[in-house]
């Protein structure tokens, strides 16, 4: 009993002496604790998470044993605490750690980053409260204290770090080779706290510089066409890029609320019941949607001309009309828009403001072929700001947050339905041989299950499933109309938005390197997609879902 008593007394003394450091450590390690708890619910704990946790503990031991004035140490660590707060937010809401991919999205797509904050401000506020409490109490407890140092423990922890990093690097080199990629892989996998945040920041700088290089390559790249058929007969091609519009809330796909009454009445509309996106982020999905390159090779997507530039090279007058804000912080989408001959942005307007602009463009055709790209706000958060009051027809069934959000979202879909049907009327009235393609960049989470997820970026059946259809005026040639009938056979096949550029090359009669008949929805060679996509955690080769099941939920 005396041994247990002595041990308990020593433990109590240690706790009294070290509690401020332990509290601060606990907060820094909280993203890892949350990730470990998440993994414990699975059959197997991710070895990388366990490795990262051990490396983090070793770094914290070095910081504790190497300096006596822990108050100053943790004061200097304030930026890392802020990064840990963001990290914890991502783990709790998206199940992902803070990586260079997320940092790059924030750096190159300021609008998407600020929209994320607007969506999740409650969650962020809660984390800030916890941070202020832990950090404030911990610093107060350390103020005026000088704690003992342990040179031996510090050296032992450093030796453990050398061994841990070294073993992982040797493993990486054995799989690949001793080169730059091996070093970058070690940096990318270092998600320890606090030093791992420096690794992710350094990798972000590398990726940002690479992205600027891709943009320079893109500007210098040339479109290599091998042929443009005179028999295609398409005079006007309109491509509407939607925003955050998931099929679960479209009555066109079986949703009980009549959110798409106009589209349901349109003859000749070919919808896709199992359409998936290539990323649940606009900054990645839109470039992929307009590229011939696979999402597995982002470098090629970023450095080569898009469908906009291809159609321009094929002799189409190209237009980029957008109700989205101009993103002056970089990214690929502004570069895609720059490939068009004519550009117009209607910022802070409802999507309906694009209709008179489109009408004016159509009136200028004068027999020339036109390719018109419309980038709309669609159903982007905040949903209540996406439609005028005349379209506020759906009311919340109760005062719950989910019912309020769902009603606003449904009204935004209703407004998009009106926009798209209005475009169809304009194309029909123009008497041009026209084709309309619509695809949303990604879907959206609407507090659908116990996880209470809102927004996009998670990579699940709600934000990876997306809406898309093809429609044409009734005056196309008989050959073209027969060709479009093949789309009926694709209705229930799993299809990626990556197929649309290849399909449009076929319908426009354009041949060029990079065209892939296995991705062409009009080709007999077409193969159903495995729906590969990019997440903040990296490339994911497959995704499987059934929208018919989801729509019935």
Residue locations for each model-derived region?
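Membrane-interface soluble catalytic domains
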Residues: 2-25, 37-44, 65-71, 139-143, ...
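SF2 helicase/translocase ATPase core recognition
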Residues: 466-468
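Metal-dependent active-site segment of extracytoplasmic phospho-/sulfohydrolases and closely related
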Residues: 238-239, 415-454, 501-505
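A long, amphipathic alpha-helix that forms part
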Residues: 59-60, 220-226, 396-436, 470
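Active-site-proximal alpha/beta segments of enzymes that process anionic O-linked groups
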Residues: 167-239, 244-397, 496-527
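Short beta-strand segments
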Residues: 320-322, 371-378, 410-413, 435-440, ...
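Short, P/G- and charge-enriched loop/turn segments at secondary-structure junctions
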Residues: 224-227, 452-459
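Transmembrane and membrane-interface helices of multi-pass
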Residues: 2-189
